[in-house]
Amino acid sequence: MLYSDNAEPIYSFRINRVEPWYIPFISRFLGPIRYDNFLGDLKGHVHPNAPWVFGDKLSVHPFNDFEIGIARTCTFGGEGYSPVNFHTFFKCFFSAGSSTLSGAKEDAGDRRTSLDFRWRLPYMQKTVTIYTDSNADDDINPLANVRRAGWQPGIYISHLGKSGPLNKMDFRFEAPYTNQPHNAGINYTNGNYRDGWTNQQNVIGSWIGRDSTGYQAWLTYWLTPRENVQLQYRDAKIDTALWPGGGTQTDFGVNVIKRLSPNIELNGMVQYERYLIPILRPGVQRDTSAWVKITWYPQIQKRLF
């Protein structure tokens, strides 16, 4: 929920190890360790203009079927705020305090954290995996205040049956929520950085957005390892505590991936959407969209000289 492809990619400098670390003695207990970092600037912000953001994530794999990770990001700098330099970077990285003064030069930044895990359940023939992701604003970890955080639990079943057509089908279900009745709109927002956790005016985190709850499901039938037909369903409810009149958004789609030849792939999707969001437009709205993509994979032969 902290970082997704819901928004335009951030132009950034990234450091990421290709293979996991195996640290003597420590990896005996924590298993393989992955560490990922990035630093870049955000676009489309007005209050303030041109802020920067950094993020880092640490994940460990203590057991064969269990993985857990923690992550954090911090938006800092921007027009009228502290300049972007090593001092403000390290202050944003290490500070545990907060500033409520709008435009304050000593503002540590807009900080948020995340906790995620993935567990492939035992005694299920390694076919069922449960997982969750989270987002917490101005908390050192989502577990520090579970009720303030947004959560996105999910389940993945790699095979619905042992043989026949069901053996070629997988199923995924997720139920994200960010609505907090006691503290509306706390996720993906900030008092000083008023454009919130966005890039090009789109939320960088989960598609569920601010103060909403919903669920999403995918049912996929695999024709071959490279070809499939997928049914998608998504429903979201916008809380009236933040948005006047609330709202509902529902969409259903069919996606097909087909290989026309070993080097050419056809990918197409049709989606139907129905939504009722009074603050945007009165009455029930409906729309249908479709797209087709053709991908060519050239065969490049390596020659030894």
Question: Locations of the language-model features?
Answer:
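Aromatic-lined, polymer-binding surfaces characteristic
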Residues: M1-S12, V18
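Outer-membrane beta-barrel "beta-signal"
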Residues: S12, L58, K258, M269, ...
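Signature for the C-terminal beta-barrel architecture of outer-membrane proteins
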Residues: S12-W197, R210-A217, W222, Y233-L242, ...
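Extracellular/periplasm-exposed beta-strand and loop segments of Gram-negative cell-envelope proteins
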Residues: E19, N202-I208, G253, Q271
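Hydrophobic, well-ordered secondary-structure elements that form the walls
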Residues: F173, L219, V256, G268, ...
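Flexible, solvent-exposed loop segments that connect beta-strands
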Residues: W243, P278-P282
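C-terminal structured domain segments
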Residues: Q249-I279
